Amino acid sequence: MNTKFFKYIIPALSLVFSVNFTSCLGDLDVTPIDPNLNVEFDQNANFAKIYAGLAITGNKGPDGQGDIADTDEGASGLMRMLFNLNELPTDEAICAWSGDVDVYPLNFAKFTASNGVVLNMFNRLYIQIAQCNNFLIQTEGKDDEESLTQRAEVRFIRALDYYYLIDLYGNVPFVDENTGIGTYVPERITRANLYTYIEKELKEIEPQMKAPRANVYGRADQAAVWMLLSRLYLNAEVYTGTPQWSAAAEYAKKVMDAGFSLAPNYGDNFLADNNTSPEMILPICYDGVQTRSWSGLSLSPALSVVT
C-alpha cells in the first residue's frame, strides 16, 4: 500500500472540503441584492392588505396568487361566502344551480366540515386574524397618532372576524398577538368566553377610533364599533345564555344619532355611487380598475327576483 498517497491526499481533501463548505456558507449569508425587495415591515402596506382582505381574494386582482390554495379563488371572498352562509339557508334567497356541490346544499341548511364554503370561510377569517396579529406585533410600542389609530382599526377588523366565527361556528380556536408562534393546535375558546373577548376589545378601542364619518371612506370608525356591539348584544342570548336587548338598542341608537338612516330608495344601495347612501356605516370598497374580485355583491334586487 502506498502510504505516501494517504499522507498527502487526505490533508489535501480536507483542505478542499473546508474551503468549499466555508464558501457555501458565505454564499448563503448575503444581503439581498434585489432593490425591489423590502425586508423591513411596511406598516401602511400591511394595513392596506388587512382592509383589502375584506374585498379581494389574493394579490393579483380578480384571480391569481390567491390567499387560499386549492380552491376556486373567486368563490373564496369574504362577502360572497358570508352571503351564501347567511342568506341561502333562509327563505330570503336561493341558488338554484344544483351543479355547485358546495353552494346548493346550503339552500337546505346542510352544513358539513367538507363543504367548500364552510371550510373556506373558516380559512378566510383566520388568514385575516393572522394578518391582524402580525400587524399588532410589528407595531407594538408605536405611539404616534396614525399608528395608534391604525392599531385600533386592526383590532376592530380582528373583532369583526371573531364575530363572524362566533356566529357561524361557535366554539373556535383562539389566537391573538400574545399567542406563541410555532406549529401547534390552538386551544378552542367557548362561545361565551369569545363573546366576552369581543365585547372587551370593542369597548377598549372605542375612544381610540375616529368619530363617526370622520375617517377615510372605507375605514372603520366609532359608528362601526357601536354597530358591531349592537349586533353582538342582539344575539347575546344565543352566545351566552343571557339576553342583552337593552344594550343592543342602546348602541343601535348611538348609530342612528350619529346621522345614519335608511336610504329613501332601497335599490340605491346597489348602485356604483352608493358611497352617497346614508346607510353606509362600514362599506367594503370595490373598484373596477384597482380593486377587482369575483366575490363582490354587484346584484340588482330588481334582476334577482324570481316571479
Annotate each PLM feature:
Residues 136, 165, 173-175, 280-283:
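Structural recognition of the beta-strand scaffold that forms the well-ordered cores
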Residues 234-238, 249-307:
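Polar, glycine-rich mid-to-C-terminal structural blocks
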Residues 155, 226-232:
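TPR/Sel1-like alpha-solenoid repeat signature
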Residues 44, 48-57, 93-169, 185, ...:
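Conserved, well-structured interaction surfaces
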Residues 24-79, 270:
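Membrane-proximal, proline-rich intrinsically disordered regions
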Residues 1-32:
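Bacterial Sec-dependent N-terminal signal peptides
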Residues 166-167, 173, 235-241:
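Short coil/turn linking the two alpha-helices of tandem helical-hairpin repeats
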